Amino acid sequence: MARYLGPKCRLSRREKTDLQLKSGIRAIDSKCNIERIPGMHWQRRGRTTDYGVQLRMKQMIKRYYDVLEKQFANYYKQADRLKGSTGDNLLKLLESRLDNVVYRMGFAATRAEARQLISHKAILVNGEVVNIPSYQVKPGDIIEVRSRAKGQLRIKGALELAQQRAPISWIEVDTKKMTGTFKEQPDVAELPAEFKVNLVVELYSK
């Protein structure tokens, strides 16, 4: 399945929540009517089945992290092999993707922009160039914007926008040096309350 290249607002409307796919320069509700599901024209929908609810939750989380269907399925398989809660493991794996960490640290306004920076070799991990967006960041890893990219206006703008977001406990950022440390495994309790990951586990357990 190819990556979705259509209107980002449409995806947020489909899931009835802000998937943080836009830069955040303007409030999401100023440009996107989240309550209106695309293509429905306000007509009443039929009763949603348990499977439908589970599928929607999977789609919401998959779109939030902007990963493809096959990637998401592989993350679930990996999470299921690890010790502990499969659902929590899944979210930790997704949160530890390099593109997500770059976004969380404020070096990019969106995860899509973070992927672009990584692909263009503008990001260092422990002093080495890493151009794989799905690279799994480990506790203690230091993420840095490459010297030649530090003057980019979009990165400076992203850092300003990041100040408006709630701080994340598992990362530490030096905005002046454009470096950050991935201190520890993500705390799933700090992730969006809408994420009912147990529904995803139920879906894949069938």
From Swiss-Prot:
Q: Where is the S4 RNA-binding domain positioned along the sequence?
A: 96-158
One Gene Ontology term, aspect cellular component? small ribosomal subunit
- Alphabetical list of Pfam families matching this protein: Ribosomal_S4, S4
The protein's UniProt keywords, in alphabetical order, are: Ribonucleoprotein, Ribosomal protein, RNA-binding, rRNA-binding
What the entry lists under InterPro entries is as follows:
Ribosomal_uS4, Ribosomal_uS4_bac-type, Ribosomal_uS4_CS, Ribosomal_uS4_N, S4_RNA-bd, S4_RNA-bd_sf
One of its GO biological process terms is: ribosomal small subunit biogenesis
**Which pairs of positions does the record mark as disulfide bonds?**
none
Output the SUPFAM superfamilies linked to this UniProt entry: Alpha-L RNA-binding motif
Metal-binding in keyword set: no
Physiological role: One of the primary rRNA binding proteins, it binds directly to 16S rRNA where it nucleates assembly of the body of the 30S subunit. With S5 and S12 plays an important role in translational accuracy.
Q: Partners and quaternary state?
A: Part of the 30S ribosomal subunit. Contacts protein S5. The interaction surface between S4 and S5 is involved in control of translational fidelity.
State the similarity comment: Belongs to the universal ribosomal protein uS4 family.
Name the UniProt record assigns to this protein: Small ribosomal subunit protein uS4
Q: Which organism is it from?
A: Coxiella burnetii (strain RSA 493 / Nine Mile phase I)
Identify the gene encoding this protein. Answer: rpsD
